[in-house]
């Protein structure tokens, strides 16, 4: 049975939020301000799930999705919304979370940072699975809210040269003896050739190695093999091919390995660093802490302008990489690094640090609750 609803807002997953006789309904495919006819797909005590059957009154910001896999692939959830409106919708979700979850209101909202909407991803984890009823091996993102792998022929958010590899990768994996024991291919891009990391649960035999080498030559990529955790990743042959990127505005070059964390969108990353530097308003006598510093993405620009910079990160390999990047940019005498689990720190932890008068905190999605609780009262 079809139900007519008015979409009041959008959640962080891109679902429309409506009310039906006072009950919250999450509507797949609905946009804020629209009137839609929906079909209820799941009913829970406190909410319902629904999908749009017909848009009766469309949003002026509704657009035709550019990706042929939109609606099935879970990689993107808001392509039916104009790109600028997507940014505004995400900002409203953030403000709502501050209000309803954090019980706070932002005193100031900075202008959003925007970059290219297509071909921007320089990092991705692609699932690999043989599905006989779909014709063989699938390589791609998961289907929306599912553990199934989407049947993808292309991906518009990947660089075109990498999107073009999806079908050849399917053919390659289909031929591997370890086809059913290779669950993931991780892609990472710097300013050189793409790197592909094959996660394998069994040793790779000589015949499979030969196929991987042939793929390297034909498609101008480099392979890494990862038998266990990220620290076990190693190049298929020869020396490790270190990836790199440049922050042109600061004259800094960074090196990293394909399994080490970097920002997905290099264009946005450059703008984020610029924004952070403006907000810090650095003076030559500042002593700055950079928490969750990673490989030194923010640390090194800060070190160029501050008297002392202290980068802290939970991953020892990333701290080693940060030190290498500092040395490579001639900043070793202006920066120091330390390994610390920033999710488990004592209340007096800040008292154990070198003297600092400014902090930059760039946590992962898990947040920085322990850090915030330990902040000195004057911070």
Where are these regions (language model features)?
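Internal alpha/beta scaffold segment
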Residues: 148-183, 189-193, 202-227
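Short, acidic/hydrophobic/Gly-rich beta-strand patch recurrent on exposed beta strands
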Residues: 16-21, 140-143, 322
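Terminal RNA-binding accessory module
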Residues: 1-65, 69
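Hydrophobic beta-strand signal
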Residues: 37-39, 125, 289
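Short beta-strand micro-motifs enriched in acidic
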Residues: 30, 39-43, 127-131, 188-190
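Rossmann-like S-adenosyl-L-methionine
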Residues: 12, 175, 203-379
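Extended interfacial segments that mediate partner engagement and assembly in macromolecular machines
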Residues: 53-65, 71-182
């Amino acid at each position: 049975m079809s139900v007519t609803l008015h979409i009041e807002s959008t959640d962080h997953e891109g679902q429309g939020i409506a009310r039906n006789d006072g009950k919250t309904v999450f509507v797949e495919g609905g946009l804020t301000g629209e009137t839609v006819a929906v079909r209820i797909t799941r009913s829970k005590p406190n909410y319902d799930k629904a999908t749009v059957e017909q848009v009766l009154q469309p949003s002026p910001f509704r657009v035709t999705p550019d990706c042929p896999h939109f609606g099935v692939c879970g990689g993107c959830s808001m392509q039916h919304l104009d790109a600028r409106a997507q940014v505004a919708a995400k900002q409203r979700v953030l403000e709502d979370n501050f209000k309803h979850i954090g019980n706070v209101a932002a005193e100031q909202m900075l202008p959003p940072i925007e970059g290219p909407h297509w071909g921007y991803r320089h990092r991705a984890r692609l699932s690999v699975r043989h599905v006989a009823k779909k014709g063989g091996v699938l390589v791609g993102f998961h289907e929306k809210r599912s553990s199934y792998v989407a049947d993808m022929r292309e991906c518009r958010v990947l660089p075109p040269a990498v999107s073009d590899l999806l079908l050849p990768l399917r053919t390659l994996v289909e031929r591997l003896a370890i086809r059913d024991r290779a669950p993931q291919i991780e892609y990472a891009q710097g300013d050189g050739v793409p790197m592909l990391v094959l996660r394998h649960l069994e040793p790779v035999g000589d015949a499979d190695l030969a196929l991987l080498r042939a793929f390297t030559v034909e498609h101008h990529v480099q392979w890494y093999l990862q038998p266990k955790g990220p620290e076990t990743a190693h190049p298929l042959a020869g020396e490790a091919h270190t990836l790199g990127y440049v922050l042109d505005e600061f004259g800094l070059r960074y090196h990293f390995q394909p399994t080490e964390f970097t920002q997905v969108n290099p264009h946005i990353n450059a703008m984020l660093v610029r924004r952070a530097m403006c907000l810090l308003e650095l003076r030559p006598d500042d002593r700055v802490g950079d928490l969750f510093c990673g490989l030194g993405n923010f640390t090194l620009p800060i070190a160029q302008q501050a008297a002392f910079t202290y980068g802290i990160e939970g991953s020892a390999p990333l701290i080693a990489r940060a030190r290498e990047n500092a040395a490579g940019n001639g900043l070793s005498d202006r920066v120091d690094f330390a390994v610390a689990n920033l999710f488990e720190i004592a209340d007096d932890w800040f008292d154990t640090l070198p003297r600092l008068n400014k902090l930059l905190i760039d946590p992962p999605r898990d947040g920085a609750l322990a850090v915030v609780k330990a902040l000195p009262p004057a911070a």
